[in-house]
């Protein structure tokens, strides 16, 4: 009889942080874009520009994280992983709570950028802990369970926030007041559930370093690139990751803004994205279980192909029921591709170099996110007022912008096939 998979205490605490930060991720992909559209609309910003400004804000945050990530990676591989991880968590939580302090749309975007920088910087440290808190054999399963419980756990604070926002009149509140409460609830959830990992994690894998870490960070980044180029399978994988995760992150970040820009019902959009979280929970666990039976590389290829099809479907989205279908399909593969991509890297690198390589992976991920959000924002902006008839459907600028992501999934798939073949040849 097969032994039941049981998590260790450290693995459980590591997964708890996924539950903690996923509350912010869910808020970013649901309520925050809608609230921003409300602020921008009240300030006289044209509705055709909502998606563009939102996309540019996401792009700015990813540029900043790409600059910071090498420093995070270098510090992570020394003996500073835990204290700097704490600082990034505090930055993200504080900025999240502060987002309710302004009703000026541009200042709101500025605070939002700071919150995203704190969030993504903490993820560099968090991901780099994975090779230390578990074994190679358990890594796929633990990584998948992190995403799975992150999806379902984040529903708890989100439902509380959603009830406050949708029924704010019944509570004697304005939408702005309800959003202030939503930001505070999310920040508190994020901070409190971070504590178990902060208390129990002890860094065991590190390299000795002398000199100033900040000064050495970008030198280390160059060395890491050179090391990755020597390890050609790692280098090719990071290139593939850059392209395929591009579409994944962009769809996550801009789903609500996309639906809102198309004029779809706000309540329906939020409930559909709540469905995404519920669907993602069992599907992420299933992918973790499948990784014990099937090759991780094969599963990643399946996810990329499915995401390509999802993007094509999303391009033709014109009604709410189609958004519900899109939300369900995204939920089926979102957790799987993120979890397997994270653990795949952990298997092909040395544990003591995990910080710098996961920092490099984060640069690739954020660079991809920058490319994706900028691409969507740019295409949306230059095609304002243009309608294209395809199969009898009138596609607007937002539809065309989403369709532009398909080519990146295709490139990611082709490069990953090459990288996976190279990795297998080394075994």
Where in this protein do the model-derived segments appear?
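A membrane-interface helix-boundary motif in multi-pass transporters
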Residues: 47-48, 165-188, 378-409
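Helix-loop boundary and gating motifs at the non-cytosolic
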Residues: 5-62, 233-272
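Multi-pass alpha-helical transporter architecture, strongest
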Residues: 189-200, 402-427
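Helix-to-loop junctions at the C-terminal end of transmembrane segments
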Residues: 67-80, 282-296, 380
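Helix-loop junctions at membrane interfaces in 12-TM secondary transporters
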Residues: 100-112, 315-327
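Structural signature of the two symmetry-related core transmembrane helices
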Residues: 83-98, 298-313
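Glycine-rich segments within core transmembrane alpha-helices of 12-TM secondary carriers
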Residues: 143-165, 362-373
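Juxtamembrane intracellular "pre-TM" segments in multi-pass secondary transporters
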Residues: 1-11, 202-238
